[in-house]
């Protein structure tokens, strides 16, 4: 694989790990030319998933959109990008296991919320505020009460 920093064509693999129940491989690489280290991910492709938006539009599924949402939700929170990648892998795995090629955006949002709820309550509330389009402070309080009632706080 080519080094993204200097363009040298023969990098070496330092470490490989399976992710997502064997559906992906994370490789830590080093360039012998500039000594930069970087991470690559290898995943197999399945049939294309189409997302049905709330207004009825259809668009190609893009895992980067989920990752970008997680990056915002986890901003200044103690979680690594690798952990976020695992969350995205879990969500994609659930979508693929469903066997359907058309998925409503609401389902993706719910899956993200379920994963966030398990990992970080602050990120969960942040994501919920955007996903559920909170307009009033009472909506934040209600979500926090739900977490408290379920013993998650």
Swiss-Prot record:
<keyword id="KW-0805">Transcription regulation</keyword>
<dbReference type="InterPro" id="IPR055173">
    <property type="entry name" value="NrdR-like_N"/>
</dbReference>
<dbReference type="InterPro" id="IPR005144">
    <property type="entry name" value="ATP-cone_dom"/>
</dbReference>
<keyword id="KW-0479">Metal-binding</keyword>
<keyword id="KW-0862">Zinc</keyword>
<dbReference type="Pfam" id="PF03477">
    <property type="entry name" value="ATP-cone"/>
</dbReference>
<dbReference type="Pfam" id="PF22811">
    <property type="entry name" value="Zn_ribbon_NrdR"/>
</dbReference>
<dbReference type="GO" id="GO:0045892">
    <property type="term" value="P:negative regulation of DNA-templated transcription"/>
</dbReference>
<keyword id="KW-0804">Transcription</keyword>
<comment type="function">
    <text>Negatively regulates transcription of bacterial ribonucleotide reductase nrd genes and operons by binding to NrdR-boxes.</text>
</comment>
<dbReference type="GO" id="GO:0005524">
    <property type="term" value="F:ATP binding"/>
</dbReference>
<keyword id="KW-0067">ATP-binding</keyword>
<keyword id="KW-0238">DNA-binding</keyword>
<dbReference type="InterPro" id="IPR003796">
    <property type="entry name" value="RNR_NrdR-like"/>
</dbReference>
<protein>
    <recommendedName>
        <fullName>Transcriptional repressor NrdR</fullName>
    </recommendedName>
</protein>
<feature type="zinc finger region">
    <location>
        <begin position="3"/>
        <end position="34"/>
    </location>
</feature>
<dbReference type="GO" id="GO:0008270">
    <property type="term" value="F:zinc ion binding"/>
</dbReference>
<keyword id="KW-0678">Repressor</keyword>
<keyword id="KW-0863">Zinc-finger</keyword>
<dbReference type="GO" id="GO:0003677">
    <property type="term" value="F:DNA binding"/>
</dbReference>
<feature type="domain" description="ATP-cone">
    <location>
        <begin position="49"/>
        <end position="139"/>
    </location>
</feature>
<keyword id="KW-0547">Nucleotide-binding</keyword>
<comment type="similarity">
    <text>Belongs to the NrdR family.</text>
</comment>
């Amino acid at each position: 694989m080519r080094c993204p920093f200097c363009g040298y064509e023969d990098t070496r693999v330092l470490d490989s790990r399976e992710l997502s129940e064997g559906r992906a491989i994370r490789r830590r690489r080093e360039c012998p030319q500039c000594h930069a280290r970087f991470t690559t991910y290898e995943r197999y492709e399945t049939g294309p998933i189409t997302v049905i938006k709330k207004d009825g539009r259809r668009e190609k599924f893009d895992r980067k959109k989920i990752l970008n949402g997680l990056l915002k939700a986890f901003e200044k929170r103690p979680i690594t990008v690798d952990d976020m990648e695992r969350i995205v892998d879990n969500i994609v795995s659930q979508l693929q296991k469903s066997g359907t090629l058309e998925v409503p955006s609401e389902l993706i949002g719910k899956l993200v919320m379920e994963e966030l709820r398990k990992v970080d309550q602050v990120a969960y509330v942040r994501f919920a505020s955007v996903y559920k389009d909170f307009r009033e402070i009472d909506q934040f309080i209600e979500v926090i009460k739900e977490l408290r009632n379920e013993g998650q706080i």
